[in-house]
């Protein structure tokens, strides 16, 4: 288990990094206490998940919706049933969610391997990294809880059966956002063009609009979305600060 922090120039928070087993996070917080509480929340969530897997190994490997109870795994199973994917599709954002809840502060952002959960009292700019030439950013305003989760068929180690550079969901429910990002990414075929992606997004919105604020797909030169798209920002994403293993 390891953690470190660095000053972030020009803003009123510090950037921390925390790693424990598969959990690799970047945390933005205003003080060490919030950071420590966030870590405590993530370790609590991991502990329940690991204990559940020890008693029910299928939970770890299934790609199908799953039935289970529990404070942590219950959120994952609920999301898996909504999205039609396995419960581990929601693991990163669910762990981050508990970190945000345990932090008990007005400003905390946790990026767990590219899945972001935030409680903030001032706007922040969030970037979606799709390679150096295709990355975008958008502004997220003050919120009690917000999640920006991304699945990619081209970047990262998470399972995706699709070919999107990025399939991103914005939602007030992090577990559902994570699971639905996986589901959306799986729907994007290798040869899909703009019209194909827009058709997928329209159907996706009809099915899931009550759970999400916005869905975004980036593939090759196509940028498409449905829902309430945040204000787009020009960003230069530094690959060195991207949260990844």
Model-derived segments and spans:
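N-terminal, positively charged, Ser/Thr/Ala/Gly-biased leader segments
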Residues: 1-23, 27
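Alpha-helix boundary/capping residues
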Residues: 45, 184, 204-207
